[in-house]
A protein has these predicted regions:
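C-terminal accessory/regulatory regions appended to core domains
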Residues: 1-260
Length: 260
């Protein structure tokens, strides 16, 4: 491959990768927002979380593949597609195993919610299953809501610093449901401080339940909101798939030129 052609591929790849990063960030935020609204009573969003995870690992795999090609090229060495596949086989298998684990959690959540023996408020437990899936995608998020010696407000502050919608919703739920045995005055103070932090961070208030847990009337209203959000997210995923194909084509061309 001549230097001019390689530079052309690299420029196209970097541009596409930037578009991909921007879109991934949008999908990530919409996924978190959807979980905040829906996770306390429904598991339908699990499929979208799973798809987002799958795309995340695919992007990671493609980036690694391009990185290896560039390393060999910089050393003036040749690497074939077969060699690349062999080098990345363990990474591919690990990703497949992780995805299978996530998929089972999503399906388990659905089975749980479809059971007639499970009451409306009992289904709030599903939120914890969602957290487990999300924390495996973003392990650092687990710190904010793990049992620690820090009080709930300190954990809320840390969640706000990270713009962590999922942890925020959980901490708010802890306060509203009084899971930490807060007095009424302590609970009022916490929610007031959390609302102030939201305003400081310019986080959209409509996505954050600074109040008691959803009642049935709110759930009906938020069902329509989430359905609209899911449509937008599916459009983003379609765009993500298009960009993924572009990346695959670029990588394929780089590999073919390298083989030649």
């Amino acid at each position: 491959m001549d230097e001019r052609t390689l530079r052309m591929f690299e420029t196209k790849f970097e541009y596409t990768k930037e578009k991909l990063a921007t879109l991934e960030e949008a999908i990530d935020e919409k996924t978190k927002q959807g979980v905040v609204i829906k996770a306390m009573y429904d598991a339908k969003l699990g499929d979208l979380i799973y798809e987002r995870t799958k795309l995340f690992y695919l992007c990671q795999y493609l980036n690694k593949r391009v990185s290896i090609v560039k390393q060999y090229r910089e050393r003036g060495e040749y690497i074939s597609s077969t060699m690349l596949d062999a080098i990345l086989e363990s990474m591919r298998e690990e990703n497949i195993n992780k995805l299978a684990e996530y998929k089972e959690k999503v399906e388990a959540s659905k089975r749980y919610l479809e059971s007639d023996d499970v009451g409306f408020y009992e289904k709030g437990i599903i939120y914890d299953q969602y957290k487990e899936i999300i924390y495996k995608i973003h392990p650092d998020l687990h710190y904010y809501t793990s049992p620690t010696n820090m009080n709930i407000f300190k954990r809320a502050q840390m969640a706000f610093i990270a713009n962590d919608y999922v942890a925020l919703a959980d901490l708010n739920r802890l306060a509203c449901e009084n899971n930490e045995n807060l007095t009424f005055k302590e609970k009022q103070l916490l929610l007031k401080k959390m609302e102030k932090l939201i305003q400081q961070k310019n986080i959209k208030l409509e996505w954050i339940p600074i109040r008691a847990p959803f009642d049935k009337q709110e759930l009906v209203k938020n069902e329509a909101m989430l359905n609209e959000e899911k449509k937008r997210l599916m459009n983003d995923i379609e765009q993500f798939e298009m960009i993924k194909k572009q990346l695959e084509e670029i990588i394929g061309q780089i590999v073919l030129k390298t083989d030649a």
